[in-house]
């Protein structure tokens, strides 16, 4: 299996754009990967955008972002107020937000939802990510849930056992408002990372997995529009 280092030069600033429809999506989908990258690279800069929240969940999201991004060289967290569950009907307004984001940031890596996610809010964010950012490395993360939409990802980030435990514990501790959901447990998050670890032959037994639709190796590709 070919090993790729997401951050080419740890001494050069590397900007990550993390996008989540809801307040816990980023942490659930790629929290261990973020912790792993921050342990290895001192020059990570983050733009962290959540598109819907309420007063309680916004406080949880801010605390979670602070916890997960500890050690980042730079971090900017934005928590928005689009109507939960109705993202397809708010397409134009959310698209305007994406266009403003594109003018403000030029990330080296974008982490977003999976395009085949059955949650309509997740799917909208994934579609607008690809619609807006045409010259960037985009990895789509997965969210375990009742809808049974987990697929066969093709990009794996091995995670040591301590980091996997740290991610699972932090998600449950940070988002107390979600603990009444039957699936919102440390065991759920560890189980998915364990399964992806098996599928990628991770030495630790744990990994987070993503969908990588387009990766250009070697010389830079011509920019869209040139």
PLM features: residue spans?
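Short coil/turn linker and secondary-structure boundary residues
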Residues: 89, 120, 159-162, 184
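Phosphate-binding/catalytic loops
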Residues: 147-161
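Active-site beta-strand->loop->alpha-helix modules in alpha/beta enzyme cores, enriched
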Residues: 1-145, 151, 173, 188, ...
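Short, solvent-exposed loop/turn segments enriched in Ser/Thr/Gly
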Residues: 210-211
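A charged, well-structured terminal subsegment
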Residues: 162-188
